[in-house]
Amino acid sequence: MSGPCPRFPFCGFDLKAEIVRIAAMEPNYSKLAGVLTGFSTNLQKGERVLIDAFDIPEAMVVALVRAAREQGAVPFVNLQRARVSRELVNGIDDEQFETQAAWELARMQKMDAYIAVRGSDNIFEMSDVDPRKVSRVMRAMKGVLDYRVNQTKWVILRWPTPAMAQQALMSTEGFEGFFFRVCTQDYGRMIEGMAALEKLMTATDRVELKGPNTDLRFSIKGIKAVACGGRHNIPDGEVFSCPVKDSVEGEITYNAPTVYQGTSFDNIHLKFEKGKIVHADGSNRGRLNEILNSDAGARYIGEFAIGFNPHILEPMRDILFDEKIAGSFHFTPGQAYEEADNGNRSQVHWDMVQILSLIHI
């Protein structure tokens, strides 16, 4: 070999071009890290923050560490890889479940804030894992999740990957540009604009949802509405509440695709009586009902939310984006949030999205 070659012909990878691309992206990394540490979690001097990094560039992790320190906070980092996680879950036993959950909870209890950035080269990485093991992991980790949601300042976002660009039917470069525009927009201004809807939903009793194969009626009386503008999710743009647990009657067909526990679902159709899902159909019907049978609360609704991010217009099989689609709502089987609580408890929290129905409140 006469010398180092920046191009590897066996895979078409251009090392020099990739270095240039990463260098060009670093200002975006710094800006996004500033949003997450400054606006979303509002880190203060001396606060401990856990940075959970799933399959994301090292440069973004470094940007988050630096941004946290600029806020005076103390950063801790947990690096995770999807293929490693899959292998661990595949062979896990009860003793390891308990040890892992206890260790994760002890660590979380030392934290004041939590930032998770989740990338994925393959959203179906867990699709061939025994569903019973996935459910067992979720049950074991529920205490960690509950503590993180209710006792820390937290924010979660996806990381733009070629796989996500494919889901969105966009080029990788085009999707990256879209991602950083959406994730670094002026969320303070968005919060101001949501106040009227939050007030209306807080004062509302009856809600009716009508659309193709959809006719739902329920009450949200006495349950708080919460405006979400970049504090917990990036991207953001929704106001959520929750139905009175036994008030939901009727049926709904979700017209946005959804991926949950590594399985893709389309055209989910649910029927309700006295708040409970009494019939569930759609693609992967067997797996759908397995999830809804995970526990008693999985067949009741834990969230009703209206989405309105003006930059997000089409579904892309990523719920952190899809639940914010302008003109959409999500109606979520499973766990209710404490901020808007109907008392439903479950290891499941499955945001399912419908676009462009008629909403009467």
Report each predicted region and the residues it spans.
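Oxyanion-binding "anion nests"
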Residues: 239-280
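Conserved small/polar residues in nucleotide/adenosyl-binding loops
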Residues: 359-361
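Active-site bordering "gate/hinge" segments
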Residues: 23-250
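Short, positively charged and aromatic/hydrophobic N-terminal segments
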Residues: 16-21
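Short, glycine-/Ser/Thr-/acidic-enriched flexible segments
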Residues: 56, 120-122, 161, 223, ...
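Dual-mode signal for accessory low-complexity, basic/Gly-rich regions
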Residues: 279-343
